Amino acid sequence: MDSQFFGLLVFYLAILLILAPFLGRYIRRAMEDEHYAATAWGRWLERLMYRLSGVNPAAEMTWRQYAVAVLIFSVLGFIAVYALQRLQGFLPLNPVGLGAVSPDSAFNTAISFVSNTNWQGYSPESTMSYLTQMLALTVQNFLSAAVGMSVLFALIRGFARHGCATVGNFWVDATRATLYVLLPLALALALALVSQGVIQNTAAYQEVTTLQAQSYEQARLDSTGQPMMDAAGKPLTETLVIQTQTLAMGPTASQEAIKLLGINGGGFFNANSAHPYENPTGLSNLLEMLAILIIPAALCFTFGEMVGDRRQGVAILAAMTLLFVGLAWLTQNAEQALTPALSHLSADGLLGNMEGKESRFGVAASALFAVVTTAASCGAVNTMHDSLSAMGGLGPMLLMQLGEVVFGGVGSGLYGMLAFALLGVFIAGLMIGRTPEYLGKKIEAFDMKMVSIAILVTPFLVLAGTALAVSVPQGLAGMLNPGAHGFSEVLYALSSAANNNGSAFAGLSSNTPFYNSLLGLAMWFGRFLVIVAILALAGSLAGKRRLAQSPGSMPTTGPLFIVLLIGTVLLVGALTYVPALALGPVAEHLQARP
């Protein structure tokens, strides 16, 4: 780890861990305290929304009712996003005159944004109108994040309550998460990004004259559109000179802010946060990285406060941070060094592997952003992940395959890590012959079934989907690179979709009916099967009586528990993928060696 990256990592984590406790305390009170002074400004609006929608905020739900509400809400969101894409050619705020999105791409995109994945198989600036970007995609960036946070609060209430049949009210949780947490933070971040040069307008695309003309050769075509040949049978060409460029415009900052805070990741432009209109400066890059992890880190403190012991949240956060630092080190070391092939040629490796990276960020900031965005289930990128070295790409891929629990998504990261915590405690209890318990709740057979479903759904989707994609002609047709790297592209795509990340190895041609359907189904089931299992677990825990702490109870706040949790995540989460990783990035790395 070089000194520049080490300094950047320490500075970044210091700011993150200083801010997280304050935000965590605010989130708890904003979500649970109806008399919190800091949210008094929006209470009238909250009550109005309940009245207009016919919601009784005092009526709580069982876990089944909560799950049904989540699914209905998400299905309605899917329908709305799909319809807006298909009808955008007839709707306003479409200065470029973009037509309807194809049915398979609209299907994939609607699931992608509703599931908090934001996988983009299309180029946004040439596919989506301003209205679709604002009313469909940006709105779902808020709502999908609110769903994840709501499910987490239902699970935390399961730990905090005892002898109770309910886990909260989804409509209240989603409303408060959006109104009091996501909207204020997004407004503040959007203004900060605008100050750094991120654009925010609804102007038509601009055609500008470039400083230097570009020329290229193009085949001459006859009246039928076929290439013209000379007497020797060679194609005739003509030289074209271009000195203009079309610059895409749009309301970028407002979508950029919530894409990061909501850990959605879908860019307003195809280059995502590598685009200077989305991420123009070093300061904007730092703000974007902080925005990605601030809510997941803060929710660890929220969890500790709600269960009555802040040390519980700190222990979870410590495990996340240690895993994060380890994989950041792996990625940075791989990117700072040249690839094995270039090293063999004695190329100058002073700058590291700069392929696919923006010179304004360099290797250190690009590698850290890659780890941040895949530690969270964000998917925003400031470098092209397909250009990472074999070992450099292994780090981000592994972070997703761990189940997006190293910080993870808004709410989803912590409830995924809590599932691993229950599994670790259960295994430890079996090893010492004691009934496993966590936070005073006895862990029984039903609980472990739900934990197993939550943990194993995504590996099944990733491995089965990858096997299908590399076994059928439609899947193989999308692989633009042969061998191990082509396999890595498919494995990365399924890992990203099933774990609701959204980033990609862009060498895979995924905007096809086959991949749009396959990845869409992986995103849907990877999101909502896990949510239903977590809510069932929450209902089971809420109904249990709290056991008194005894000398034989396993402490869940110290170094032993942190090591146990990290070991469980690595053994259960990572070992599942060892054969697939051996065929992909590991094989690619070994093949590149002279």
Curated annotation (Swiss-Prot):
Molecular function via GO: P-type potassium transmembrane transporter activity; potassium ion binding
Subunit structure, interactors included: The system is composed of three essential subunits: KdpA, KdpB and KdpC.
Keyword Metal-binding: no
Function as written in the Swiss-Prot or TrEMBL entry: Part of the high-affinity ATP-driven potassium transport (or Kdp) system, which catalyzes the hydrolysis of ATP coupled with the electrogenic transport of potassium into the cytoplasm. This subunit binds the periplasmic potassium ions and delivers the ions to the membrane domain of KdpB through an intramembrane tunnel.
Main location as per UniProt: membrane
Upper lineage: Bacteria, Pseudomonadati, Pseudomonadota, Betaproteobacteria, Burkholderiales
Domain of life: Bacteria
Transmembrane segments annotated in the record for this chain: 4-24, 65-85, 136-156, 179-199, 287-307, 314-334, 361-381, 390-410, 413-433, 450-470, 518-538, 560-580
Signal peptide: none
Family matches, as Pfam families: KdpA (PF03814)
Compartment(s) where it occurs, according to its Swiss-Prot or TrEMBL record: Cell inner membrane
Membrane topology field: Multi-pass membrane protein
Keyword terms: Cell inner membrane, Cell membrane, Ion transport, Membrane, Potassium, Potassium transport, Transmembrane, Transmembrane helix, Transport
Lipid biosynthesis keyword on record: no
This protein's GO CC annotations: plasma membrane
Family: Belongs to the KdpA family.
Protein name per Swiss-Prot or TrEMBL: Potassium-transporting ATPase potassium-binding subunit
